[in-house]
Amino acid sequence: MNVVILGCGRTGARLALELSSKGHGVTLIERNPDSLRRLGKTDGFNIVIGNGLDIDVIERAKVAEADAFFAVTRGDNTNIMAAQIVQRMNKTAKVCVKVADPERAKAYRDMGMFCINASSLLAGLCRDWLLNEPYETIDKYNVLSKELEI
């Protein structure tokens, strides 16, 4: 499988290493070349340095040929905008977006994007671990986010 990952922070680097170790082709889009140090050596990865919202950068990453695209930068807006661009360029790719704001995650899920909200996922796993309950599917954890009213 050919995968494009936008962002080489902790999540992007870990995902790249995991997928590469399973024999998948991985292309990383990253603005800051220093972030690539998280990979150790970059052999075996296709690296595109640039802004992941720039069409030229996205085209150089060959998203039109990718089987999957992950937008995992620290910025919700960047992740969502990049995912929308990729969805238009490649109708068949699986697109996953890391979103910190649970309200945004729900809105973009309703648009057909697979969104991961890390705080909801972690909270659900911790709850089930503590209560000795069986673990749920990722979709169950992703929608946990009920905000507290103060």
Predicted regions and their residues:
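Cytosolic regulatory regions of ion transport systems
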Residues: M1-I150
